[in-house]
């Protein structure tokens, strides 16, 4: 009888500990897998500025060059290749 009570209390204690730790680890995470996959897709897509658009750094331009004088994206190769092709 004492052993049964000890086992029941131990199981309840371990279950409570497991639920408490599972709750703290899941904070800030989304519950639905579909939402998680769309968040990853949004983070992976990179928006860039087309030719003749304003820029401050070369990485912002879809083309290969940001003119530091005019702060405009230009295709310095003159053949219309974007970064994804290069």
From Swiss-Prot:
Signal peptide start-end: 1-22
Gene Ontology cellular-component annotations: extracellular region
Keyword Transcription regulation: no
Top-rank taxon: Eukaryota
Annotated compartments: Secreted
Family the entry assigns: Belongs to the conotoxin O1 superfamily.
Domain notes per entry: The presence of a 'disulfide through disulfide knot' structurally defines this protein as a knottin.
Stated name of the protein: Conotoxin S6.10
Taxonomic classification: Eukaryota, Metazoa, Spiralia, Lophotrochozoa, Mollusca
């Amino acid at each position: 009888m004492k052993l049964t009570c000890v086992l029941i209390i131990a199981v309840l204690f371990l279950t409570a500990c497991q639920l408490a730790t599972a709750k703290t680890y899941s904070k800030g995470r989304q519950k639905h897998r579909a939402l998680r996959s769309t968040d990853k897709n949004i983070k992976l897509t990179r928006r860039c500025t087309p030719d003749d658009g304003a820029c401050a750094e070369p990485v912002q331009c879809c083309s290969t060059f940001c003119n530091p004088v005019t702060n405009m994206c230009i295709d310095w190769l003159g053949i219309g290749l974007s970064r994804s092709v290069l």
